[in-house]
Structures are given as structure tokens and as C-alpha cells.
């Protein structure tokens, strides 16, 4: 099975690539720079460009790409990347997700050959605060109008309803923030 992954160099992506390769999957990394080997696929979400020929060879896509949510450590001893969530940071968080989702919808709709599985990252914040209640896919989404909920709903998930091909299985992997204590990891969040 050929799987394309956006965000392959990120916190989740690099671990997922390693595991998928160990399990025998053929992994292709979407990159925004010049392609350096046969297992890379060029894409530019901000310019709405993608190598459609390589896209059409994939069986599945896992879409993880987006601006890091992690704050910078203002004290200088936590190796986190990112920055405070000021207006500019929020814009990068939102648009880095929205452009990618929009590009995939456009590419699917312009293609007669396409991956039949599309897995997108999203956030558990889409549900709002339910206290101690166990959250499932059927849990009511609270519309709090907060930025984190806006990103999950409008940037990650809603655009995907525009994919016209009804035989594409769309999976929404709603994650919370993840951390590691691995000191060798340069991206702790």
C-alpha cells in the first residue's frame, strides 16, 4: 500500500513514517521544497500546487501538516518550537491547515484516479468542554466560537465535505496536544 503523508517531519509524522515503514508500507512524504528522492511528492498549499501524477499513485493520504501549536519557552529551558498565539501565529495556524485541506479537495475533484482513503488530523477541541463525560464521534459539538474550535472545524474538517467522489473514505483523527519526555526529540510538542 502506498501512503502519502503531509507533516512527515513533525512530532506525530516522523514517528508514524517510521512505524509504517517498519510495517512494510511504502511511504511518500509531501514536501514544499524541491523533491530530492522518489519517495517525496511536491506540494505547495499556499500556492495550491501539487504533483498530481504522484498523488494519483497513492492508495491513502494522511494529512498532518500545519503550523506547530507549541509555545516557545520564554525561559529558555524547554525545547519547544512555535511562539505565543498572537494574531500572526493564529493566522499561520489557521491557514497552514486550511490551504492544505482546500488543495486536497481541489486535487481530488480534478482527478479521475485518486487515493481511496483520506485521513486528516483535527482537534478534540471541536467538542468543547464536556467535563468528565466520555467523548465519542456522536458527542454533540459545542459551538463556543473559540479559535481552537474554529481551526478544527473550518480549517481541517469542513472543507473535506467538498470532495465529490463518494467512494473516498474520510477519517477525522481528532487529537489533543501530545508531549514527550524524550530529551533527544527536538520537537517536544
Predicted regions and their residues:
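Rossmann-fold cofactor-recognition segment
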Residues: 37-47
